[in-house]
Amino acid sequence: MNAPDKFASLLALTREPFPASTKSYLAGSQPGLRVPVRDIQLTNGEVVSVYDTSGPYTDPAVQIDVRKGLASVRGEWIAARGDTEGYEGRVRKALDDGQKAEDGDRLAQLRAEAAALQRQPLRARSGANVTQMHYAKKGIVTPEMEYVALRENGRREWMQQYMQDAAREQRLAGNPLGASIPKIITPEFVRDEVARGRAIIPANINHPEVEPMAIGRNFKVKINANIGNSAVTSSIEEEVEKLVWAIRWGADNVMDLSTGKNIHTTRDWIVRNSPVPIGTVPIYQALEKVGGIAEDLTWEIFRDTLIEQAEQGVDYFTIHAGVRLAYIQLTAARRTGIVSRGGSIMAKWCMAHHKESFLYTHFEDICDIMKAYDVAFSLGDGLRPGCASDANDEAQFAELHTLGELTQIAWKHDVQTMIEGPGHVPMHMIQANMTEQLKTCHEAPFYTLGPLTIDIAPGYDHIASAIGAAMIGWMGTAMLCYVTPKEHLGLPDRDDVKQGIIAYKIAAHAADVAKGHPGARARDDALSQARFDFRWQDQFNLGLDPDTAKEYHDETLPKDSAKVAHFCSMCGPKFCSMKITQEVREFAQQGLQSKAEEFNRTGGELYVPIHRAD
């Protein structure tokens, strides 16, 4: 079977809608601006609408051919601005895919399979700047900003019944810890946040298929999933399947961290079929081009790689420009040294040449490339701690201060920027990370890997890190990079990806509730009510993972009759606290009814003679 057929068969597995769910769209102010939401139909007639990241893959009305890629969402908006131009683009090389011979059979096969995915690249016209930050600073509200506003608000009508009790809402009000979250997100609010640098909308002009989203402290906490092949395992079709699988379960962004063969072609398939922003670490591919020898890296090779990936449509680059020569010695006393792949590559280059990294010395040149395509910076934390005992040390914070300086340079060029953070941090040290980042990086969005709160959980690091992720998300982190059960152990498979995403959706949602994001708790209330009403199917379907919830329930009570029973296998029919509570309420109601009847029987008077009452 050829590769495209493999893609088609794999994607068929993950195109079905969620149980009891349909895709609907919120209409914007102009034709073509349609924001997806997922509507969950409840058995009591209610409809609960939730934020949706799955793109057209869960919409049966949309025809998808992965050989050709998704339909354009933003193409007309980009063209209407009149500040871009199409051009021939750089010449594709065998080395881009890790191949040595330009006329090899494998290379010809790869290119043939991806032929329909090729697009003419766009770039900014001479003298133009096409970043969302540039438009925002000029006071322009773009369609992307309106899209974000509609997406953040969602369809809120259904929430009102759960938010009518003013006393309860006051008691449960969140603590935003300094965030400024309005009750309604307006397009103007989005514009202002992007202009200030407090939010980014990752949306390369060469990725028109992307459904715009925002990463920022004053928006919903987002999560990122990592995929990518390696030198020892995985294939192109597996990575596309992981992409579709990841966004199905809630990944807001996906990073392609491929380090093996066929990097360029893998990225073609991923970007063209992705409705979410795609990020990369360009130094990985640059290293492949020099045979894996860090010392042989040059600015020219790296620059060529940036342009290659920008032309393909990558939305944000992780660039470890904060790893400076003077900081490397600060890691010498660490228990685990430098654990970032990109950080260790650049540290080795700096030591071999005994000079500052070309990522640092050419930073403004990099900005010129970024603003020509609207690629956002994800300034990498190459010196992040790799274990709890290395957290918050001098090396980590020295790099963070440099990232703050680089942020201001990027903003001078109107390049959207977010800051990457740790890593491994004990719970009691997390707040210091957030405080330091807000202060030194001028409120640019923070994007953290966890952090893992302990180091003794191999196989369960998704749990150890989700604890830290929930905390730092509440404190102000804008996006959480997921951790899977395979962290530190191996490359995650399909099931690992799902487990990592669900763990991080829990963390992100917990942070939104704690911050008091408008309406964040309504879905919890809807599920709680379904639980109290013994609407089992609604409980399953309102959860983050309906399939697993139903599977666990059916392990002991598989019959359809159990889906309407007023008990589960944990307590049984006689010890269910919620059933008992309902009976108590019924008894209380009967008692009140009895007293009312007695009141009416005695003439409806407040004070009655004793003989009449008798």
UniProtKB/Swiss-Prot annotation:
Q: Does the keyword 4Fe-4S apply?
A: yes
EC assignment: the record states 4.1.99.17
Which cofactors must be present for this protein to function? [4Fe-4S] cluster
Which range is the signal sequence, renumbered to this chain?
none
Pfam families xrefs: ThiC-associated, ThiC_Rad_SAM
Which chemical reaction does it catalyze?
Answer: 5-amino-1-(5-phospho-beta-D-ribosyl)imidazole + S-adenosyl-L-methionine = 4-amino-2-methyl-5-(phosphooxymethyl)pyrimidine + CO + 5'-deoxyadenosine + formate + L-methionine + 3 H(+)
Main EC class of this protein? lyase
**Pathway recorded for this protein:** Cofactor biosynthesis; thiamine diphosphate biosynthesis
Keyword set, alphabetical order: 4Fe-4S, Iron, Iron-sulfur, Lyase, Metal-binding, S-adenosyl-L-methionine, Thiamine biosynthesis, Zinc
Q: Which residues bind Zn(2+)?
A: H424, H488
| One MF annotation (Gene Ontology) recorded for this entry | carbon-carbon lyase activity
Keyword Iron attributed: yes
One GO term of the biological process aspect: thiamine biosynthetic process
- Note describing how the cofactor binds: Binds 1 [4Fe-4S] cluster per subunit. The cluster is coordinated with 3 cysteines and an exchangeable S-adenosyl-L-methionine.
What Gene Ontology terms describe where this protein resides (cellular component)? cytosol
Q: Where does [4Fe-4S] cluster bind?
A: C568, C571, C576
Residues binding substrate, per UniProt: N226, M255, Y284, H320, S340, R341, G342, D381, G382, L383, R384, E420, Y447
Q: What does this protein do?
A: Catalyzes the synthesis of the hydroxymethylpyrimidine phosphate (HMP-P) moiety of thiamine from aminoimidazole ribotide (AIR) in a radical S-adenosyl-L-methionine (SAM)-dependent reaction.
User: Which family is this sequence assigned to?
Assistant: Belongs to the ThiC family.
Q: What is this protein called?
A: Phosphomethylpyrimidine synthase
Q: What organism is listed for this UniProt entry?
A: Acidovorax ebreus (strain TPSY) (Diaphorobacter sp. (strain TPSY))
